Design a protein with these regions (language model features):
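Histidine-rich, glycine-flanked metal-binding segment
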Residues: 32-36, 47, 51-87
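Active-site gating loops and adjacent loop-to-helix segments of metal-dependent hydrolytic enzymes
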Residues: 97-118, 126, 157-158, 162-165, ...
């Protein structure tokens, strides 16, 4: 019922967005969608193809929503992006797109109105798209579903959304028997889930202890596979090994995983999505807005400060494990939407990740983890025309990720602030 109300409220947002575009030439210039059937040619001097290669002095031809050709002689040129760095739209594997601060400035909870929830969700989606993220995985809330639908139908501008709907929260035996967990997975599939999010550990604010048995995790991951769904498991410490052995798709966080755990993940083809900084930095920056709301205490904030260096060390260790697939996810919550790219800087500066590897983690590797490698994540013929341009070269200066000047998703230009 709440999701239905939010969807109706999202429709109301459209009228406000329309009025804003009419009253602001800057907004209309950057957000006015282009006809999707028009043939578009982009000229670029530097293209990161999303797979680890750099293309020089080429042109990208778009027809409808897809990349039709990469041809240095194509013309006429519609967008001259020479002097910028062109690359695929980024993919964030872990966000909470509907989280926001309420009217009182605090982390919004169940007391917010559906109207407020809808407005803020739409604003979060817009901020995320403008930051260069054309696909996100929101894990999860039932409110994700109407937002996903509104964006997919073109009613609202925002990134492509994949959602877990409701997560499976580990509470030991109270979580349910293996059969009950299987039923939970089937229920999420029926509700429209693209994946299953599983909490196999407490929050790091509560110590990060394991909360599900091997039998429970085996049931969840096995049933998800039967339903054609991927599994993302929030796991710390021992839960990393248990979830990996259960056959999950991706480990979220992974703090305090051992080197043997990381090697096991590489052997089993399990993706790792660590967070090097943004999520904790955002919590600390907005401490007054979270403190006192459910799950946020002084002790919890002290715990987060202590593990920040452990997160840096995890990224450093993981990057040295042959064959381990590290994807890009931010765990963006209230206060972080639109600042997702800061995680790139944290990973390169504090985690020692190679800048090209950082870009690939949010492009082709992120698409592979989502099972969408044949649709998004690369500048390649036949894939969706999700294309962004940066003022600067992130391979030389990772801070260039803050300077997104062009955003195209599915062949539609939503932002064009490139110098002319």
């Amino acid at each position: 019922m709440r999701s239905t109300k939010v969807f109706l409220c999202l429709l109301m947002v459209l009228g406000v967005c329309g009025q804003a575009q009419q009253s602001s030439s800057q907004v209309s210039k950057q957000s006015q969608p282009m006809p999707t059937e028009k043939r578009i040619v982009i000229a670029a001097s530097t293209v990161l193809d999303g797979r680890g290669r750099v293309l020089r002095n080429t042109r990208i031809v778009i027809e409808g929503s897809k990349i039709a050709a990469i041809d240095s002689k194509a013309g006429p040129v519609d967008y001259d992006l020479r002097g910028l760095t062109v690359l695929p739209g980024w993919i964030d594997a872990h966000v909470h797109i509907t989280w926001s601060f309420g009217k009182d400035g605090k982390n919004a909870g169940s007391g917010e109105t559906t109207q407020d929830a809808a407005y803020r969700a739409a604003a979060n989606a817009w901020a995320t798209l403008m930051a260069g993220f054309t696909t996100v995985q929101s894990v999860g809330s039932p409110t994700d579903v109407p937002l996903r639908g509104a964006i997919a139908k073109g009613l609202l501008p925002g990134p492509r959304i994949l959602t877990a709907v409701e997560p499976l929260t580990g509470r030991g035996e109270r979580t349910g028997t293996p059969d009950e967990i299987r039923e939970f997975v089937r229920k999420q599939k029926a509700a429209g889930a693209d994946l299953i999010k599983i909490f196999a550990s407490q929050s790091i604010r509560q110590g990060g202890a394991i909360t599900l048995s091997p039998e429970q995790l085996n049931a969840a991951c096995d049933e998800a596979k039967k339903q054609g769904l991927r599994t993302l498991v929030h796991a710390y410490k021992d839960a990393v090994r248990v979830a990996t052995r259960a056959g999950c798709t991706e480990i979220e966080h992974g703090t305090m995983a051992t080197d043997d755990d990381l090697k096991l993940m590489a052997e089993m083809g399990t993706f790792l999505d660590p967070q090097a900084g943004l999520v904790i930095e955002n919590y600390l920056l907005n401490k007054d807005k979270y403190l006192g709301t459910p799950g946020y205490t002084e002790e919890g904030f002290a715990a987060m400060e202590k593990v920040l260096s452990l997160n840096h060390q995890l990224v450093q260790r993981a990057s040295k494990v042959p064959g381990l697939k590290i994807v890009f996810g931010t765990d963006a919550v209230a206060g972080a939407h639109g600042r997702n790219a800061e995680e790139f800087i944290d990973r390169v500066r504090d985690g020692g990740i190679d800048p090209m590897a950082a870009m690939v983690s949010a492009n082709s590797l992120g698409a592979e983890a989502m099972g969408l490698a044949n649709q998004i994540g690369s500048i390649a013929v036949g894939l969706e025309a999700d294309i962004i341009a940066l003022d600067g070269d992130p391979l030389k200066d990772i801070a260039a990720v803050r300077r997104v000047v062009v955003v195209m998703k599915g062949g539609v230009v939503y932002k064009n602030a490139a110098r002319r």
